[in-house]
């Protein structure tokens, strides 16, 4: 897939303190890319530099190959962004808000406004005043504003903040639709691990302004040695039969750390001992597990971030 945004050694120093430390990575079209990290990790600061709201101390951001520092006007036209909360005129209707925003962008027609309204699912309420909108509807109206000029990259800072579960799901579904149907790159930041796992294709894990790692959220590749769970009828007997393996006994089976190629041999051993097997599955690490491993934080610290 084509690279649409690239960070090259991006650094931010404030009063002698390094807030963002030498970030470099690329983002591709058609993917939802997440910034994950606790509050204070540097997610919003990075986004502000990506959209030109904050100067870089070092490095550069390339948007569709154009430099945010040297060709700002050309680069920023490819971006649609909501940093923190969408700014809306609450005493105007949703439609009037979009008309106001359209005046700042060349070539936005009535048909285009109608198109984005339908895309974000606000057709039935677009002529109501924004002050009557729920928080989720305001987020969707902000999303519509961002889409009026057909950006290649959509950047959203904490897009699900304050939303109820239904509102979170709505936003998530709309973002996936944009990547799937329009090939847009969507960049989101959040400290909510469970939501990022559902929303993103890849994530960059930030901690104290540094890039810890970039991971595929739904990585189907099983590690060379992974943990497998064997649900059996006689767990204690199974543990005895398999005592040469690194295993952990459970009430309804055993967990064994082994290579994928060894699984058939383990099954054969159990069958030979007439131990009934009901299920064999790999125990995959959740995004939370991987995040905690890489950052060294506890579950309690993440939950209160």
Curated annotation (Swiss-Prot):
InterPro entries: AAA+_ATPase, ABC_transporter-like_ATP-bd, ABC_transporter-like_CS, P-loop_NTPase
ABC transporter domain ranges (all copies): 5-233
Alphabetically ordered keywords of this record: ATP-binding, Nucleotide-binding, Transport
Tagged with keyword Isomerase: no
SUPFAM superfamilies, per the entry: P-loop containing nucleoside triphosphate hydrolases
Membrane-crossing segments per the record: none
Keyword Nucleotide-binding: yes
SMART domains the UniProt entry points to: AAA
GO molecular function: ATP binding; ATP hydrolysis activity
Protein residues bound to ATP: 37-44
PANTHER family for this protein: ABC TRANSPORTER, ATP-BINDING PROTEIN
Family listed: Belongs to the ABC transporter superfamily.
Protein name as it appears in the record: Uncharacterized ABC transporter ATP-binding protein YhcH
Organism: Bacillus subtilis (strain 168)
Taxonomic classification: Bacteria, Bacillati, Bacillota, Bacilli, Bacillales
